[in-house]
Amino acid sequence: MFKNPAERPRKLHELSSALEIPYDELRLNCVYCKGQLTETEVLDFAFTDLTIVYRDDTPHGVCTKCLRFYSKVSEFRWYRYSVYGTTLEKLTNKGICDLLIRCITCQRPLCPEEKQRHLDKKKRFHNIGGRWTGRCIACWRRPRTETQV
């Protein structure tokens, strides 16, 4: 489909524009389980702003089940440390709103309100493999079952 790696779209909106197909008509397979993503999963992939992966010049996304599973695997393998928001700002020399912080469970980028909630509730941000994570509002309410990082 896209032979030249330099010309490959990296985000779903770029792929949609390149193929001139709306999001809801895009058909992607999961890079892990090889199953076809549902329409909802394609839209979630776009909203999560993850990068498209190419296998044999074909674009792949990730289904919700595999995304949550491999997020947990990454947490177990690559967890480094946790810090409060004020400490994170001092470590990075950036404001909390200027940092890309993703949800530890669903990988959605946290909005400023979700980051502020961590500060208000005195919850920590986690460094997992050099990337900062927290919890989005949707995952905030779900109880953590295996680990309390």
Curated annotation (Swiss-Prot):
GO molecular function, one term: zinc ion binding
Keywords from the named record: Activator, DNA-binding, Early protein, Host cytoplasm, Host nucleus, Host-virus interaction, Inhibition of host innate immune response by virus, Inhibition of host IRF3 by virus, Inhibition of host RLR pathway by virus, Metal-binding, Modulation of host cell apoptosis by virus, Oncogene, Transcription, Transcription regulation, Viral immunoevasion, Zinc, Zinc-finger
Transmembrane region(s): none
Zinc finger region(s), unnamed: 30-66, 103-139
Subunit annotation: Forms homodimers. Interacts with ubiquitin-protein ligase UBE3A/E6-AP and thus forms a complex with human TP53. Interacts with human NFX1 and MAGI3. Interacts with human IRF3; this interaction inhibits the establishment of antiviral state. Interacts with human TYK2; this interaction inhibits JAK-STAT activation by interferon alpha. Interacts with host DLG1; this interaction leads to the proteasomal degradation of DLG1.
Name of the molecule in the record: Protein E6
Family: Belongs to the papillomaviridae E6 protein family.
Secreted recorded as keyword: no
Note: Belongs to the high risk human alphapapillomavirus family. The cancer-causing human papillomavirus E6 protein has a unique carboxy terminal PDZ domain containing substrate.
Subcellular location: Host cytoplasm; Host nucleus
Gene that specifies this protein: E6
